[in-house]
């Protein structure tokens, strides 16, 4: 995908990895970058606008846990304004295994609902032009951090959902791929709660091992966007970008 002159919606594009990715995207010159986030960050938005004044950066308040109908209403507002959207990035996520319901609601259900909502505008069966979905999942979707099983399972679910959307592309015209960061130095991982407090030092233990910066992750994220490979499972770890070959153990045969 050529980012220049495109229209992009980025859910949670003002967070750690999200903000640095937004910076890299803006440098590439899209026509519009629409940021949907729960918390407004005027300083970050102004920085993005100053980084490339030719890019129109807009913000809408959005909580991914709202009902599907509300998400559709918000997207209609955006589509009415832009007419077309090329890429949806789903980046909302929390890491706190004390908040079981919210972890599933944000990390999985929110991704499903936002993707489902945009199908009203993209699905070729409804006369739509198709589109591209990039879902930020996690390497914990491959192999869990077992001390945070709820978080890991929510990311595995999002990864599975993304793979299914990719396989449905011949029917819907909508392609999809997953972005799976390894341990990245963000506020998210500096301190978080393990499930039932099984390991109070889990964040500290993870950060004892090699990590990557948000800038490294963001730069590789943009490379994955540009590659635009339907069904790709991208691992962004230790400053490297790698396409993962998924091992199939079972097939529905349909």
Curated annotation (Swiss-Prot):
One of its GO terms (cellular component) is cytoplasm. NAD(+) binds at residues 10-33. It comes from the Eukaryota. Substrate binds at residue 138. Keywords: NAD, Oxidoreductase. This is Alcohol dehydrogenase. Belongs to the short-chain dehydrogenases/reductases (SDR) family. Gene3D superfamilies: NAD(P)-binding Rossmann-like Domain. Homodimer. It catalyses: a primary alcohol + NAD(+) = an aldehyde + NADH + H(+); a secondary alcohol + NAD(+) = a ketone + NADH + H(+). Transmembrane segments: none annotated. It is an enzyme of class 1 (oxidoreductase). Its EC number is 1.1.1.1. The active site is at 151 (proton acceptor). The keyword DNA damage does not apply. GO terms for biological process: alcohol metabolic process. GO terms for molecular function: alcohol dehydrogenase (NAD+) activity. The gene is Adh.
